[in-house]
């Protein structure tokens, strides 16, 4: 529900009026995970739903089964700065896990250089290439990382897409 837009919320209201007493509407969403604002999504629809429909029973799924407490503590600390969130506190029984690190790069080249050096250091200390992974938000970010990996003989695979220089739009230009 966190990624619905204003029109979709109006449709819901047209189908089931907030004045209805049938309690026949159920909504699932996570106000901390709205990522489609660039497509018109309005996370405020969740709070509006709670207010407009006078929700009396709100179930918060706060236990996380995949992440460690170090990761969840960091996530809780970051998202706590959002004054418009509905509020929850994520927790786990998975243990503390490894400490997390944060690196602030000045630009994409510095980020790729640092990432490359970290992976080379891991590999030199015995970590197999297959145990290293890089996650990025969109495919355009892979270009500079691929350049650094290639220049440093780091083998890599792209899952869910093509290598930057194998993409048709890049081939047409070069």
Describe the predicted segments one by one.
Residues 15-19, 53, 149:
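Active-site catalytic pocket residues across diverse enzymes, especially alpha/beta-hydrolases
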Residues 32-37, 66-67, 158-174:
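Short alpha-helix plus adjacent loop in nuclease-associated cores
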Residues 27, 41-48, 70, 114, ...:
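Generic alpha-helical secondary structure signal
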Residues 1-48, 63-67:
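Conserved helicase NTPase motor core
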């Amino acid at each position: 529900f966190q990624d619905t837009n204003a029109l979709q919320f109006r449709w819901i209201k047209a189908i089931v009026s907030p004045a209805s007493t049938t309690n026949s509407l159920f909504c699932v969403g996570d106000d901390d995970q709205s990522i489609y604002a660039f497509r018109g999504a309005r996370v405020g629809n969740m709070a509006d739903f709670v207010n407009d429909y006078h929700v009396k029973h709100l179930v918060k799924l706060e236990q996380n089964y995949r992440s460690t407490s170090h990761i969840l503590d960091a996530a809780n600390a970051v998202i706590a700065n959002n004054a418009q969130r509905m509020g929850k506190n994520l927790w786990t029984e998975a243990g503390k896990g490894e400490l997390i690190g944060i690196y602030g790069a000045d630009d994409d080249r510095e980020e790729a250089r640092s990432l490359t050096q970290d992976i080379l250091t891991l590999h030199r200390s015995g970590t197999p290439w297959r145990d290293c992974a890089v996650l990025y938000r969109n495919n355009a970010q892979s270009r500079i990382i691929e350049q650094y990996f290639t220049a440093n003989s780091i083998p890599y695979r792209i899952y869910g897409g093509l290598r930057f220089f194998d993409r048709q739009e890049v081939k047409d230009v070069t």
